[in-house]
Amino acid sequence: MRKLARESAFQLIYEYQFLKELNEDTKQALILRNKLDEDDVRYLDEVCAGVVRHYDELNQKLEGALDRQRPERIYRCDRSILLVALCEMLYMPEIPPKVSVNEAIELSKIYSTEKSGGFINGILSNFLPGGSDHGEDH
């Protein structure tokens, strides 16, 4: 199920922010626990590889979309959710951008603070077609 694969990707990227590498043991445990099928594992590999490959660029785009908040003040949980969603939006055209935004908000309801959903929605809306594209210039 894509929802569980996306949640697994979020968890791997959260861990990546600390370790600076994708942990294969964690990945295998998530695949088994969430009973991910072949398509889900393919998605998981694609999104995690995309975030790692474009990590600095994605972070710059996120920081460019901030209004007044200092980048280092973003909760790592929120940043992980944002990285997964933004990778989908920019590098995985088969996923509708609004789906990425909605799923990111849903993840924030489970893993982050009460206000995170609105924050995440505000940041990602900059990258929707017709959004302000703050991140594109930075």
Descriptions of predicted regions:
Residues 1-117, 121-138:
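N-terminal interaction/assembly modules
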